Amino acid sequence: LSRGLGDVYKRQVTGPMKVDCIYRRIDDNFLDPKVFYKHSLLGVPGLFKCWRKGNVGIVNAPGTGIADDKAIYSYVDKMIKFYLDEEPKLKQVQTFLCRKKIHKDHVIENISKLVVKPTNGSGGNGILIGPKASKEERENMIDKIKSKPSDYIAQPLEILSTTPTISEEGIEPRHLDLRPFVLTGKKSWVTTGGLTRVALKKGSTIVNSSQGGGSKDTLVIER
């Protein structure tokens, strides 16, 4: 990609082609070396200026990475009440913020019953599933929590639903979760359907593709 005259272009053999929208998964800091990390080789110089002018769309938009911080889980129900003045129809899973001493003490004392996650983690990396972890793994996590409590949250282990999945042994149940998508323009709406992620490893509850997870088509029987 390159920038010219306030627009973004894709380089092609036949000549440059104007780009209307960019789907990105890299961090904000790497988007534009003129605005953020100056040594970035992933971004496009001047991209941020084009975006601010409205000449190109970026999905996910700069700034939306705040939703990737797992500490925000603790505030979901409060945000619904604050912005919509409604009670959530589906309650957020109870979330303990280890940066709060009372929460940290509870997590350390009950780590064998909880799932501990790094607040800035992704791809299922760094997660400790307390009921399945060894004593040594739990002790190592406790040391990490004590060292940098603000880097971790914890939640009760939720029992995920299962779906029939073809394996080497035949059709077997595998754990899954459903990730819906909310689109926002002049108004906001939830898409019909979503991304169903499946833990392909037997007994696993980690659905992330980077950890061996897969995906399935999502069929909405009744709306």
Role assignments for model-derived ranges:
Residues 1, 116-119, 207:
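Short, flexible coil/turn micro-motifs enriched in small/turn-prone residues
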Residues 1-9:
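Single conserved hydrophobic/aromatic residue that forms the stacking wall/gate
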Residues 5, 47, 72-75, 83, ...:
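Short alpha-helical interface elements
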